[in-house]
């Protein structure tokens, strides 16, 4: 019987709850834009932003630009900044590894098994998540979308 030499993990929704983080972050962004004066319905705006993500990709960096332009005909930077700042704060507060991820990675690494991550996220975003979660020291290789 051959010994396992390596394990490869997906990042989003395997090591961390990406969709929960995204939900909280987008809802916070909508609230931030409303607090800045954008006159929109909170619930339908959340649904519309999710639809934009589904159309353009979950890692798209221009989603709020598209949303604001659809609402008022141009990108008002006051609303954009409010949305981005609220999004980032909520993202950081809700970016958490699933239970036992650290314990499992530590046990695998201590047993000499090489560990890797594969992600469909762009490199910068994947590495940001890995560092936010303090998991960077476990992985021998990280392979990303780009």
Language-model features and meaning:
Residues 1-46:
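Active-site neighborhood of HAD-like aspartate-dependent phosphohydrolases
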Residues 24, 28, 48, 63-66, ...:
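Alpha-helical elements of Rossmann-like donor-binding domains used by nucleotide-donor carbohydrate transfer enzymes
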Residues 32, 67-68, 107, 129:
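Residues within well-ordered alpha helices
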Residues 35-40, 71-74, 134-138:
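Short helix-capping segments at alpha-helix termini
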Residues 40, 51-86:
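A metal-dependent, Asp-based hydrolase signature
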Residues 44, 87-88:
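Short, Φ-rich (hydrophobic/aromatic) sequence segments
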Residues 80-86, 92-96, 101-133, 139-146:
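Substrate-recognition element of Asp-dependent hydrolases with the DxDx(T/V) motif
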